[in-house]
């Protein structure tokens, strides 16, 4: 609706009514503008799906633009290597790491604050060394998060995927 509020790591959402006949979106200067025809029924399931699709497109764009380079920067800083980075639309996992050290990241990461995005990226990078959640894995997580792994893990649980 006109009062829709949403803030992501890189943009805020601005949904508004317009005299135009069609929906359109534009990501500009940290704002995702979604224009809706003046008679739009926001309770309509088709409208809800369209708005969600627009938001997913913007999240995917931002995730592809920012996450691979951020992951590689963190990898370099902490001495990790990964073979590939992919962005996908997972509804159940923030990220995953394959035995070949390929890291998959959910576009929903862009809904998190940056310190939690970094936590997830570091979590997946730690899996390039420890493929399970053993004590060695958590010791490594504590090392790269300056002893805050458990605190960050608890904070992450407060967030939901798109």
What residue spans do the PLM features occupy?
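Walker B catalytic acidic pair
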Residues: 124
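Walker B beta-strand of ABC/ABC-like P-loop ATPase nucleotide-binding domains
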Residues: 121
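Active-site-proximal or metal-binding-adjacent scaffold patches in catalytic folds
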Residues: 1-118, 128-162
């Amino acid at each position: 609706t006109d009062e829709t509020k949403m803030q992501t790591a890189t943009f805020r959402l601005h949904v508004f009514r317009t005299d135009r006949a069609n929906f359109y979106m534009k990501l500009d200067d940290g704002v995702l503008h979604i224009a809706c025809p003046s008679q739009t029924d926001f309770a309509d399931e088709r409208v809800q799906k369209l708005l969600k699709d627009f938001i997913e497109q913007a999240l995917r764009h931002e995730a592809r633009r920012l996450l691979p380079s951020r992951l590689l920067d963190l990898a370099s800083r902490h001495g990790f290597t990964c073979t590939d980075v992919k962005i996908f639309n997972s509804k159940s996992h923030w990220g995953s790491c394959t035995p070949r050290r390929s890291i998959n990241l959910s576009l929903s990461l862009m809904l998190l604050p940056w310190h939690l995005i970094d936590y997830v990226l570091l979590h997946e990078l730690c899996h390039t060394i420890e493929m399970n959640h053993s004590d060695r894995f958590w010791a490594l997580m504590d090392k790269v998060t300056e002893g805050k792994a458990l605190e960050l893990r608890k904070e992450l649980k407060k967030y939901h995927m798109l």
